[in-house]
């Protein structure tokens, strides 16, 4: 854990095991607590007024994807696309990334510098807020009865199955998610139009007023288009979807105290993208009745 983790960066009811040095200096983000309250108030206002707004969470992988650099998750054949960058309309992603309403980025100085290189917009809030407000369940309980999810088909199916268990409902403080909107786990960027059709058709029948999303690099071309299909707040929370799936790396910001609930049925996890999850932290295995 960070040797000098400042109180400035503490958020109620969750623990941050992220060892980045930015959490040890006030200069990283002096208004962290003040802006956290602004962020929460903004979400409440947007949902209560049924405003349709998009939040794009930027990470270092998005930097490489938007530059068409074959690094990590942005490498063809790895996760986002099976084709080479010159075989897709990459410019649609570059242009789309600039068309969202709000932008979040971790307070890591290097990530914020990368953001400014590829997206000519202001960073509105730290991405850590999205993680923490799922980790401490605030967002789940504040918007109970209004929340849907958007993410990889395999993870949506895992969460659906987990939510059948009263024990998991109790842990989240939430009886159900209103909608599960699926997209391909791998290679969703190969055909942006096809992925949009898949997601759009599901959104047309949705009832949620706020969607928590984790959709990989396809978000750069897709997020700004979602408002065409339903009026809702679209909040990109990235790896927080993995937490709801029970497979979060607890060293991700603010998930240090998270319990990964999993189901004793291996077939549910076949082909799932575990990202950095290696089994650390607290786990509860739910048996099928």
Where are these regions (language model features)?
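Electropositive, gly/pro-rich neighborhoods at or near active sites that engage anionic ligands
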Residues: 2-173
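Glycine-rich beta-strand-to-loop/alpha-helix junction loops that act as flexible
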Residues: 213-216
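Residue-level detector of flexible, active-site-proximal loop/helix-junction positions
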Residues: 110, 185-187, 241
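Short active-site oxyanion
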Residues: 145-147, 208-211
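C-terminal functional extensions of proteins
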Residues: 218-289
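Short acidic/glycine-rich loop or secondary-structure boundary segments that cap or lie
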Residues: 66, 156-159, 188-190, 221, ...
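A mid-sequence, solvent-exposed acidic-amphipathic segment
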Residues: 168-210
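Conserved beta-strand scaffold positions in the cores of enzyme catalytic domains, especially
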Residues: 55, 149, 176-182, 234
């Amino acid at each position: 854990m960070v040797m000098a983790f400042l109180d400035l960066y503490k958020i109620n009811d969750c623990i941050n095991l992220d060892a980045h040095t930015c959490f040890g200096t006030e200069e990283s983000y002096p208004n962290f607590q003040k802006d956290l309250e602004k962020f929460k108030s903004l979400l409440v206002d947007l949902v209560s007024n049924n405003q349709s707004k998009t939040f794009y969470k930027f990470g270092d992988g998005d930097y490489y994807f938007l530059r068409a650099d074959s690094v990590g998750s942005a490498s063809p054949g790895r996760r986002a696309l099976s084709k080479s960058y010159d075989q897709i309309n990459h410019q649609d992603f570059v242009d789309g990334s600039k068309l969202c309403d709000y932008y979040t980025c971790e307070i890591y100085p290097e990530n914020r510098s990368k953001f400014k290189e590829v997206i000519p917009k202001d960073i509105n809030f730290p991405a850590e807020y999205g993680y923490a407000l799922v980790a401490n369940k605030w967002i789940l309980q504040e918007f109970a009865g209004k929340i849907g999810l958007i993410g990889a088909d395999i993870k949506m199916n895992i969460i659906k199955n987990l939510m059948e268990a009263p024990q998991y409902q109790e842990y989240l403080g939430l009886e159900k998610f209103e909608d599960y909107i699926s997209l391909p786990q791998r290679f969703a960027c190969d055909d942006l139009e096809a992925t949009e059709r898949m997601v759009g058709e599901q959104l047309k029948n949705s009832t949620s007023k706020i969607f928590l999303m984790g959709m990989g690099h396809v978000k750069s071309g897709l997020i700004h288009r979602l408002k065409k299909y339903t009026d809702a707040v679209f909040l990109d929370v990235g790896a927080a979807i993995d937490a709801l799936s029970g497979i979060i790396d607890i060293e991700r910001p603010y998930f240090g105290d998270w319990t990964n609930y999993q189901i004793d049925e291996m077939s549910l996890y076949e082909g799932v993208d575990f990202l950095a999850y290696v089994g650390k932290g607290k786990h509860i295995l739910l048996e099928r009745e």
